[in-house]
């Protein structure tokens, strides 16, 4: 999104393997210790959660969030945040981080992921 709206930015790496997402300074920006998170240094605002970040950047730039299509955009954004993202995340967790530990979880999230990709 930052590239699309041609906004200058600086990346700060957060090493999840070192649990840097739990440090006090990062939690001031992202209270749930999740990435992504951004700071707009021009106005001192910070945002966490991808949906909130995308809406902020779209409103800031005046792109990708026009009023004529906002209801449709919001529906797909909420579908990604509440269903698609979490379900694909669970699939990834069971199949890539803990394979073979829960046959039920692996089968369930594989089927859900397969359904999501077919519907999209």
What does each model-identified segment do?
Residues 117-120:
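Alpha-helical transmembrane segments in multipass membrane proteins, preferentially the mid-helix core
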Residues 1-111, 115:
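GST-like domain detector, emphasizing the conserved glutathione-binding G-site
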């Amino acid at each position: 999104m930052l590239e699309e709206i041609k906004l200058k930015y600086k990346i700060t790496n957060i090493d999840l393997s070192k649990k840097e997402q739990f440090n006090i300074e990062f939690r001031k920006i992202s209270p749930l210790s999740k990435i992504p998170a951004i700071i707009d240094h021009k106005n001192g605002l910070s945002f966490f959660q991808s949906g909130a970040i995308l809406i902020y950047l779209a409103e800031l730039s005046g792109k990708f969030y026009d009023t004529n299509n906002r209801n449709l955009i919001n529906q797909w954004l909420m579908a990604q945040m509440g269903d698609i993202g979490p379900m694909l995340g669970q699939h990834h967790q069971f199949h890539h981080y803990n394979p073979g530990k829960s046959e039920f979880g692996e089968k369930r999230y594989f089927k859900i992921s397969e359904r999501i990709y077919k519907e999209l």
